[in-house]
Amino acid sequence: MADAGARRPFFRRRKTCPFTGANAPKIDYKDSKLLMRYVSERGKIVPSRITAVSAKKQRELARAVKRARFLGLLPYVIR
């Protein structure tokens, strides 16, 4: 039998992409409320390893954030 002090390693469950699935929201540059969830408090786009967004959807998200910034819907920098 194993040591009494030995424990099973903790396995973190892999998060799934919030933009894939049946009722997933569409990435739209006009939806600033949705986009703000993926922008940090300083105004930077949060990386996919933190938000668990797939690579394809992360590219779409970055494109939507940049387009919203250009049109004045999102700020470039939050102070």
Swiss-Prot record:
Belongs to the bacterial ribosomal protein bS18 family. Keywords: Ribonucleoprotein, Ribosomal protein, RNA-binding, rRNA-binding. This is Small ribosomal subunit protein bS18. Gene3D superfamilies: Ribosomal protein S18 (4.10.640.10). Signal peptide: none annotated. GO terms for molecular function: small ribosomal subunit rRNA binding; structural constituent of ribosome. Transmembrane segments: none annotated. One of its GO terms (cellular component) is cytosolic small ribosomal subunit. Part of the 30S ribosomal subunit. Forms a tight heterodimer with protein bS6. It comes from the Bacteria. PANTHER family: 30S RIBOSOMAL PROTEIN S18 (PTHR13479), SMALL RIBOSOMAL SUBUNIT PROTEIN BS18M (PTHR13479:SF40). GO terms for biological process: translation. It comes from Nitrobacter winogradskyi (strain ATCC 25391 / DSM 10237 / CIP 104748 / NCIMB 11846 / Nb-255). InterPro entries: Ribosomal_bS18, Ribosomal_bS18_CS, Ribosomal_bS18_sf. HAMAP family: Ribosomal_bS18. Binds as a heterodimer with protein bS6 to the central domain of the 16S rRNA, where it helps stabilize the platform of the 30S subunit.
